[in-house]
A protein has these predicted regions:
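N-terminal cap/lid segment of alpha/beta-hydrolase-fold proteins
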Residues: 3-41
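C-terminal, loop-rich substrate-recognition/catalytic regions characterized by aromatic stacking residues
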Residues: 196-215, 303, 308-404
């Protein structure tokens, strides 16, 4: 199949403004880095809202191109620290402010000098969540979003898995990222040092019980990570979680979406549900038709780019598996934000998927692929399947009682 051709630096020169303030509806000021192209006319905005620090948009050579690269293609690129993180003011609480702050930031960015009023968003993982949560508020100037590796719900597939708390993901992730960076933002060196040390030995904390008194996240101090303990206090899918569910709000999303997922990504199921949910329930006919998902042989971290490094998981597959993401994003934004003709957008729902083993790309119009046959598989063993070298089996045939 044909991807858009690999694209070098664009024609526009770029300047960067650091820590540009944006005032939210409650008066909190969030800070963004703004990459300005030297264009002679107003240009669209590409926005990223991140909890990992604005500089993180520049340091993933196996993932996205840099903000300056996108800006060189004559876009005004805005990378903002979300509330309570990095240079931004306010108090961080996982997901709680991302819908309203996302709406306010989209409208602020649309009114920036040099903007033509059209805004697209991009980003992966939590930075995909900041897009969806903004989109369900339907800001008038949001035209499209491009989320990657992000689930459809922040209870199922993120914090819990079929009712089981995702300890091995949640604890180290919070210690090493959102709780740590929020402590830096608050200027609390004691908590920063404690979290840094705990994250360095994250595996040793996986055996700690009970979760509700987990020492590294300081249950006695609500400034550290109150969302961790609130999540434990809400082990079922109740109103706490429904506030920021994506799957429950597809009918409020009015924009086309370019989705990216990987076969080895922890959030694959949710990403695919976002695609099928938008095709079925998007707020408008144009939104339902304007869905495209690309599912590659990638994990959550490295997609690989032909002009940088291969994703580690792809080293035995070769360049056929390298990511077309940046060129697809650029073509997608060119179509929806600049009105340019495109063969990759506007033709109805599309699924591009990499067939593992055969190492080929395919395109279809629906998921599951039309004609898919489902097969039930059964776990079995002779009683010694409790190690990686055990005698466990996976068979399409049901085993008789006793393992025979």
């Amino acid at each position: 199949m044909g991807w858009p051709p690999s694209t070098g630096t664009g024609p526009c020169q770029v300047t960067k403004q650091a820590d540009v303030p944006a005032r939210m509806r409650d008066g909190t000021v969030l800070k963004a880095d703004v990459y300005r192209p030297t264009a002679h006319e107003a240009v669209p905005v590409i926005l990223m809202r991140t909890q990992y620090g604005k500089a993180s948009a520049d340091v993933q050579p196996s993932r996205y191109q840099t903000p300056a690269w996108f800006a060189s293609h004559c876009y005004l690129v805005v990378v903002q620290d979300i509330r309570g993180q990095g240079a931004s003011g306010g108090t961080f609480y996982e997901y709680a402010n991302d819908a309203d702050d996302g709406y306010d930031t989209v409208e602020w960015a649309a009114a920036l000098p040099g903007s033509n009023g059209k805004v697209g968003m991009y980003g992966t993982s939590y930075v995909g969540a900041t897009q969806w949560l903004a989109a369900i508020r339907t800001p008038p100037h949001l035209v499209t979003i491009v989320p990657a590796n992000t689930p459809s719900d922040y209870y199922q597939n993120w914090t819990y898995e079929d009712g089981a708390f995702r300890l091995a993901f949640i604890e180290p992730w919070m210690m090493d990222t959102i709780a740590l960076s929020a402590a830096r933002q608050r200027g609390n060196p004691k908590i920063v040092a404690e979290l840094t040390e705990a994250a360095r030995n994250a595996a040793s904390w996986e055996h700690y019980r009970p979760y509700a008194t987990f020492p590294p996240l300081h249950p006695e101090d609500p400034s550290v990570a109150p969302y961790f303990f609130d999540a434990i206090r809400h082990p079922t899918y109740d109103e706490y979680w429904k506030r920021w569910s994506i799957r429950g709000h597809y009918d409020q999303v009015t924009v086309p979406v370019l989705h990216f997922e990987g076969w080895y990504d922890a959030f694959l199921a949710g990403g695919m549900e976002n695609f099928t949910g938008m095709v079925a329930h998007g707020a408008t006919a144009a939104a339902r038709a304007g869905q495209r998902i690309v599912i590659g042989p990638w994990d959550h971290i490295g997609w690989g780019r032909p002009d940088s490094i291969e994703a580690p998981i792809l080293k035995h597959i070769g360049s056929v598996a390298n990511s077309p993401i940046n060129e697809l994003m650029l073509a997608w934004f060119d179509h929806y934000l600049k009105g340019q003709p495109s063969t990759i957008a506007g033709s109805g729902p599309t699924v591009d998927y990499f067939e593992m083993g055969a190492n080929r790309w395919h395109s279809t119009t629906a998921w599951p692929v039309p004609g898919t046959r489902f097969t039930r598989y059964y776990l079995g063993s002779g009683g010694h399947a409790n190690t990686s070298t055990g005698d466990g089996t996976l068979s399409p045939q049901a085993l008789r009682a006793g393992g025979g």
